[in-house]
Amino acid sequence: MRSRHFSVVAFVLTSLLAWAAPASAEWSELVKEDEATYYFDKEAVMPVHVSRFAWVLTDLPKAEKTPTGENYKSMMLRVRMYCKNDTVVRLSVSYFDKQMGKGKEVSSDDVHEWRPREYPIRPNTYLAALKKEVCGGSKAASG
């Protein structure tokens, strides 16, 4: 019984540490625009077959509203990027009251669909810049 309890506690702590990792990430700038600056965590990119999991941080110059009405100044987005077919899936998003993913998490949303919707990666966007960084050339995209 004691070892089972320890296993559950260890699993929960490991899960929390994995979720907290992006908060202490080394963010690399992707794109800077008037309305937002986009970053990604190079160290957290995880290749799985022909796709890549990545964290994206969006920093805003002034507060905006979440879909539920809370003010936020930054958001962290977890995505799965499909390198071969130029699509991306949003897995989760967290909104923060301060820039660079700091301060209080004011809202979050995780995709709970069995098959999340894929969106096309449009040229000249932060997602196109992310694809270039995480998928690289044809060798990275094919393996």
Residue ranges and their predicted role:
Residues 21-77, 82-143:
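N-terminal secretory-pathway/extracellular module detecting exported/lumenal segments
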Residues 9-18:
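Bacterial N-terminal signal peptides
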Residues 1-10:
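Bacterial N-terminal signal peptides that target proteins for export
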